[in-house]
Amino acid sequence: MNVLVINCGSSSLKYQLIDMDTENALATGLVERIGLEGANLTQKSEGKDKYEIVEPMKDHQDAIRLVLGALIDEKHGVIKSLDEINAIGHRVVHGGEKYAESALVTEEVMKDLEECAKLAPLHNPANIIGINACKALMPNVPMVVVFDTAFHQTMPEKAFVYALPYELYEKEHIRKYGFHGTSHKYVSAKIAEAMGKNIEDLKIITCHLGNGASIAAIKNGKCVDTTMGFTPLEGLVMGTRCGNIDPAVVTYLIDELGYTSQEVNTLMNKKSGIFGVSGVSSDFRDVEAAADKGSKEAQIALDLFRNSVKKYIGAYIAEMNGCDVIVFTAGVGENSIIERGAICRDLEFLGIELDEERNNIRAKVAEISKEGSRIKLFVVPTNEELMIAQDTVSIVSK
């Protein structure tokens, strides 16, 4: 069975065609600048040259038409006919409170997605456009939506309700939702498998540390808390996002410094975090290099990030009344020996003991804790596309 996984952004589209018999990606591609000058598609597949197309694409339907063409291209394609695509899985950022798991695309589901669009105005509209484009081009192929928020719907009220008037939650659905759920779900299942344990017997802290970053507390296979909130802005210090901040800073920026609400939104989402504090970059490698050369701001930025991760690890150990394993995943979590080392330093009193030699690895499933460490430490590469494909197979097979 072949599943096409699609992740639509406002002017971009990522895709993978996955053979679910082997769970290998037959092709991986990216379409950029949809609706803009210089629109292009790049596709990679094993044993074939990289395929690049520069061609005008007025909308996502044009983009998906090109994707389908690339997949069956005589020279660069990986399948002979579109009939070999058995299902399509769409990443959707926000499923609101209604969806605690993935769902088959129906008229009712599409209406719900439209309603959730106000909760994720930067993402859900693009996701919806992608689904409609696929429906127009491949009307007979079953489609599934996989939500970033779904995995976190098991959180209890004490974790997701904000201490605002309760009617704002009841009427306006203002609450913590959490994001990166597909990644947290994937790596928590993978670590249970790697340890040879039943996930229902484990207390797991998953650290998805990339340009966007979040941590989840997973007890007996269910998420009980996570760092991102009503939007992906809450929680950790991130590449360009500020993370937790006194909400009164927002009103101060508007009332005293003359910012508009949109300017504050842009400031906190795109100009803050590691990038804003360091003044260098949102790329940890660049900021680490600047800190090594004596940049005070770069060092402060790194310290803020590391401290925010440490604080949540401590909090989640308390919240779950213990922890069996901490998992590092995503770009920084999988690849940064420096950041993992700095985060785990001085946590021995909690039973967290990093092995410096074992930590000298990148992007593979590996234990990095010392023998005898009470809380195990692991690196587990995430694979959100495979998780989406697995959910898609599970739903269409029902």
From Swiss-Prot:
Primary location: cytoplasm
GO BP annotations listed: acetate metabolic process; acetyl-CoA biosynthetic process
One GO MF term attached to the UniProt entry: acetate kinase activity
Chain positions recorded as ATP binding sites: K14, H208, L209, G210, N211, G212, D283, F284, R285, G331, V332, G333, E334, N335
Active-site residues (renumbered): D148 (proton donor/acceptor)
PROSITE patterns per UniProt: ACETATE_KINASE_1, ACETATE_KINASE_2
Binding residues annotated for Mg(2+), in chain numbering: N7, E384
Cofactor note: Mg(2+). Can also accept Mn(2+).
Cofactor(s) annotated in UniProt: Mg(2+); Mn(2+)
Annotated positions binding substrate: R91
Site entry (Transition state stabilizer), positions: H180, R241
Keyword Transferase: yes
Catalytic activity, EC: 2.7.2.1
Known catalytic reactions: acetate + ATP = acetyl phosphate + ADP
Similarity comment text for this entry: Belongs to the acetokinase family.
Protein name as it appears in the record: Acetate kinase 2
Gene source species: Clostridium perfringens (strain 13 / Type A)
Gene: ackA2
